[in-house]
Regions:
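Short, conserved catalytic/metal-binding motifs centered on acidic residues
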Residues: 1, 31, 72-81, 102, ...
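Acidic, His- and aromatic-enriched active-site or binding-groove loops in soluble protein domains
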Residues: 13-22, 54, 92-111
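Short amphipathic alpha-helical "interface-anchor" segments enriched in bulky aromatics
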Residues: 192-231, 235, 239-246
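A short, flexible helix-boundary coil/loop motif
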Residues: 243-315
């Protein structure tokens, strides 16, 4: 949100505010940022994304090939439901590199949901689940064919019908919600519910994005020039990754400050424990000493992490 400014590139975004339309790509579950590309606010999510994928996906493949050689799953929201983007990702599959699959939220566009609901209701093969009174859900798979694309792909569909809302109010007409997820993951390894669960993890993307805006204070970018703000975003991604690495290495050991168990720590926590430290500059015996103190709760973790970085040639 950069409303109330005349900054270059600020425009009306799909969320209804004046700002930018950044593209953020993260690798793994810890929030390591592969790219934070700044784009004009009026730009559509999928516009120009092919060029971004040409950089991002091979980068993820190289990182995976240098480690556990794990396959890559590209997870995208409905704004990227595009056959051109799928072809671009398919082109990244080559010998010697980790396999690339994708999971994209389907955009129903002009699908007649009421007509589809009537067809499913008339089909005896449809299996409905009833999680509560006045609500039923059905999930099914269907094969998808894209012109010029030979790789098998399927779409997991879910239709939710409500005749009573969550508060017990009877509805005059049924309410339907149609959702879908397009994927190249094989059904024998990932059933429909597994695909839905995999996509639910996409919510962590918003958590990572909020850390840029709050913890790194990038809610409103500093410059009126678009290129300068794009550089700020690139440097912010670098800073984010450094802080992630410090947090993973320094705040999960037995000597880490006592906190609740977690697989990762927020950037704000990493800065509070390892960056914002009281110190004294001491001149003694023709030497200048930086005294960091040894009695605060993160002193041991800080000393251990500093030693590890020094041995690695970073100190």
């Amino acid at each position: 949100d950069n409303s109330g400014t005349a900054k270059e590139g600020v425009g009306r975004t799909y969320t209804g505010v004046d700002g930018y339309c950044p593209l953020a790509a993260y690798l793994g579950t810890q929030g390591y940022c592969l790219e934070l590309a700044l784009r004009p606010g009026v730009q559509h999510s999928a516009s120009g994304t092919q060029l971004d994928l040409k950089r991002i996906v091979p980068m993820a493949q190289r990182l995976s090939a240098g480690g556990g050689k794990a396959p890559i799953l590209v997870r995208l929201d409905a704004g990227f439901d595009s056959a051109d983007l799928m072809r671009e990702m398919a082109a990244c599959n080559s010998a010697g590199l980790p396999r690339v699959d994708w999971l994209i939220k389907w955009n129903p566009r002009k699908t007649e949901v009421a007509t589809l609901a009537a067809l499913l209701d008339a089909n005896q093969a449809t299996r409905w689940q009833h999680p509560r009174a006045g609500k039923r859900v059905t999930v099914w798979d269907e094969q998808v064919r894209i012109e010029g694309f030979e790789r098998p792909m399927r779409r997991v569909m879910r239709l939710t019908e409500r005749t009573i809302d969550a508060k017990g109010q009877l509805l005059i007409e049924p309410q339907w919600v149609l959702e879908g997820w397009s994927t190249t993951l094989a059904g024998r390894q990932f059933d429909a519910q597994a695909i839905i669960t995999l996509y639910e993890g996409h919510g962590a993307h918003e958590q990572f994005h909020s850390e840029f805006k709050t913890d790194l204070d990038l809610e409103r970018l500093p410059s009126g020039k678009f290129d300068t703000n794009a550089l700020v975003c690139a440097l912010a991604a670098l800073a984010m990754n450094i802080l992630r690495l410090l947090g993973q290495a320094g705040l999960h050991g037995p000597d880490a400050p006592v906190r609740h168990e977690a697989k990762r720590r927020r950037i704000k926590t990493v800065m509070q424990e390892l960056i914002y430290r009281a110190a004294r500059l001491i001149d003694h015996g023709r030497r200048r000493i930086l005294g960091l103190g040894a009695n605060d709760r993160s002193a041991q973790a800080f000393a251990r992490l500093h030693g590890q970085l020094a041995l690695a040639g970073c100190g």
